[in-house]
């Protein structure tokens, strides 16, 4: 019965755009939540019922209507770079690979806006904008592979997050296919106070309330000057205090990353303990950048920061996207990261905290991780002092599941500590399926309200079930 239904879909859209059975490549079983991560979820993934390649919002609408009537669910797919399992299918899923919907429909240079389809890769969109003297404000580590739709679905954050905001902050209007197949287009005004801001329903909800097919986004004039510098800091507390003062002074960095590293002999690459490193940058008019650096340098001198050679800053900036290439396939369904971390469980926490709680969280989090016999390998703040990341690793010796469980337990306790300090369990990647079990602890009664919204918009549960708490 299922196969007959999918066959009908293939007749409607064309067999070359509907993949089933052995024709479905293994990559559609998983996104970037894989076997080397600290998760209690099944790590093998399952083959979906079908993969469909739409070319228009009307194609998406047809597939959603079909899925709802035939009892399938629909999982949107972009670059496959999601770290939380937001694009994981079930065996009754129709995966919508949106990458053929990659047009830039228009660029308005005077208004500094663009309309682009959800499947366009962020780096390609940035290149198109730069031909018109504009740039994309969203610059995550995954930019060479991630798509616009995925960035909107997770409300992702990039290196310029403090200067430009999250991806959702840059969205003016959306084209969305709802669970009944309706194509909704929200007005792309710079500001409106005419009631509910409908586009916000679909930003950060991971395709569970509607499937984004296109967006009107802000674009930004290419800055006259971009100046990124790197510093060695005596210790993390000193660096954190200096960075906080820079923000208190009203300066607006275009990039900020304060990192400390810990030795991790289990990793297949070197990780040496040493003084924390601060990468800091400003962008804009030359005189504004110069004035910003004069203010920042005054704070850094008081903190005994040592400026590193310019090549260090250039290397940092050049390598900022390098990690994404570990997610490239080296064999069907196998990525470079799968092989690199074959004997290791690796994971991270990305939490938002009140600034006054960051140093207390650091002490607690490092203690928690070590108590679980997991090694912290990095701790830092990114884009602004309140956004904190912690990386950890545990080698696989005899029992891989034991190692994965230890890392998962450490992550959960660290995230609960962030909640106890008034923070949020995730600030950049969404929750997907990986963190859904903690949503009730963060949202409280708000989760019940969110689920009422889900039932109102998608009573059959057609759109990306099991993600984002739904």
Task: Map each language-model feature to its residues.
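Glycine-rich N-terminal segment of FAD-binding domains in flavoprotein oxidoreductases
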Residues: 21-101, 116, 136
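A charged N-terminal "starter" segment
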Residues: 1-27, 460
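FAD-binding subdomain of flavoenzyme oxidoreductases
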Residues: 103-257, 462-463
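C-terminal substrate-recognition/cap domain of FAD-linked oxidoreductases
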Residues: 20-36, 221, 232, 240-413, ...
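Activity-critical C-terminal alpha-helical subdomain
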Residues: 182, 432-470
